[in-house]
Amino acid sequence: MPRTMIPPGECTYAGRKRRRPLQKQRPAVGAEKSNPSKRHRDRLNAELDHLASLLPFPPDIISKLDKLSVLRLSVSYLRVKSFFQVVQEQSSRQPAAGAPSPGDSCPLAGSAVLEGRLLLESLNGFALVVSAEGTIFYASATIVDYLGFHQTDVMHQNIYDYIHVDDRQDFCRQLHWAMDPPQVVFGQPPPLETGDDAILGRLLRAQEWGTGTPTEYSAFLTRCFICRVRCLLDSTSGFLTMQFQGKLKFLFGQKKKAPSGAMLPPRLSLFCIAAPVLLPSAAEMKMRSALLRAKPRADTAATADAKVKATTSLCESELHGKPNYSAGRSSRESGVLVLREQTDAGRWAQVPARAPCLCLRGGPDLVLDPKGGSGDREEEQHRMLSRASGVTGRRETPGPTKPLPWTAGKHSEDGARPRLQPSKNDPPSLRPMPRGSCLPCPCVQGTFRNSPISHPPSPSPSAYSSRTSRPMRDVGEDQVHPPLCHFPQRSLQHQLPQPGAQRFATRGYPMEDMKLQGVPMPPGDLCGPTLLLDVSIKMEKDSGCEGAADGCVPSQVWLGASDRSHPATFPTRMHLKTEPDSRQQVYISHLGHGVRGAQPHGRATAGRSRELTPFHPAHCACLEPTDGLPQSEPPHQLCARGRGEQSCTCRAAEAAPVVKREPLDSPQWATHSQGMVPGMLPKSALATLVPPQASGCTFLP
């Protein structure tokens, strides 16, 4: 019986493609009589199978096509073939237009097909050709990646079955050259457009002869609009918003006839590329202000989101397992973390991390400068770091190593604290500075041009006492916090700025965080001691120590010279003990590019003074020794290699200091029984990231 076709105007939305019905296998009966209708069906099925095999589709797709789909695709293929035949004939009649060479006129068939397929796959959408009647003349095979419909499902189908009902009228207007289509009644021929014959005739002649579209009509033929299209991949609404961008061109070779039998001229059709409109989320719209999401740790691998990977042009394998020191650098007390990675072009891209202070576990876990910024300053950083010694910018050669004088200071019940006695013959850069001032470090003086020797004093620590969570008790008037040396940005060229201070109440102890923009350190610059986090250092005297002052054992080692110095912590979560013998003299190492403690001042000192001449080891952990040790000539250095060379140690015959590691059982730095509460150094100032694989030694005299 004949099937009733649903008119295109009343069609519902397109669903999934049809499946070929399974053929029932009936057992063959030898005595069965011949049936003429069955023979006719068998011949028809054989012809359809042969026609389906001629379609340019793989066998697995052809096996799923029903009879009507085979006929529809055959008609569509013949129409597309007729169109390209006419286009090739037009191009052959115009040899002077392009003037192709003999080699270009006959390209290899294999390379041409491969190039066309690759071009279609490189699009961010799919190619689409829609005739003036609303029939899908052609759709590329990549349509399945965006709408879920296979190419065989949409070829020679009504486009309005895939367009949202509210967007159908707008799509119909886009198919007309003047965006004013005539009213078409279904079942009746379209009315003759007598007013448009002259315009369409001129456009047709111009396109046939290759002279190009007249400039006065080019604006009418360009199309760019948005419609909602039926999508099987979207489970929320079933529609995907897509942008159609292209032009109206004549569709040749269709050979359509009027009801009177006259040949109709080619009509304008839409040749476009349909691409999905990606509406960015709120997080993606703030890409420029949120480039980095990371938790930097000195002993863990760097973590970065997809935005950082896109910025640095690096894949997941290049970032996996890479330690944090190679991905970012902390610019001392400023706390500005700069993610620094090498791009594909061989240049270094620097991405600043901007985030507020995150207080986790009672302490600042990540303190970042919201105003910090860093660009591609590779050449300028090399110029600044090359002048890292001396005021005049000339590189100075470090002098010989000399012992530093130590005197016994004030003792308490928890141990002895050594004091460094300055000498009158000290260099100007190592003389005691006024209270609250910053000592001029050699690396800072050479960094800035025309840097004066005298620096503006920083605010006194007493100015911030009101911002702490607990008052400072049992602190002498002559005890001050050692000021910190900063590394300002390149915009500060003439003098060290006066840093602003911000205090955070952490675990009841006051601490300072200098919010000052700093110079990001390049990965290859190994310029200072490693002062890391989360490990306590203790110094204990031997039980048979005779030269110890009052027989007291200090409970901890302090960095700096005053009684209110700051404890040093390390990230390996292991305690490090040193047990100096009475025969040995412990010397302080010069903090070449690290945090320098202030010289003691305002307190009477005893003992002879010696000239202070700093030395510059590659990596040194500078520990202050105990009091009461006799002054003697410096012994041979105890060289403990870094990671990977822990078994290599060089010890003199009379060397007595012993280094031990113990599991983490952090001692209380301050208890209620202690006489004073030490001011803790901010973690941002101690977290100076240095690659552990770099060659260098830890010098413990």
From Swiss-Prot:
The gene is AHRR. Residues 112-182 form the PAS domain. It holds the Pfam family HLH. Residues 1-40, 366-434, 448-483 are annotated as: Disordered. Gene3D superfamilies: Helix-loop-helix DNA-binding domain (4.10.280.10), PAS domain (3.30.450.20). This is Aryl hydrocarbon receptor repressor. There is a cross-link at residues 577, 660 (Glycyl lysine isopeptide (Lys-Gly) (interchain with G-Cter in SUMO2)). PANTHER family: ARYL HYDROCARBON RECEPTOR, ARYL HYDROCARBON RECEPTOR REPRESSOR.
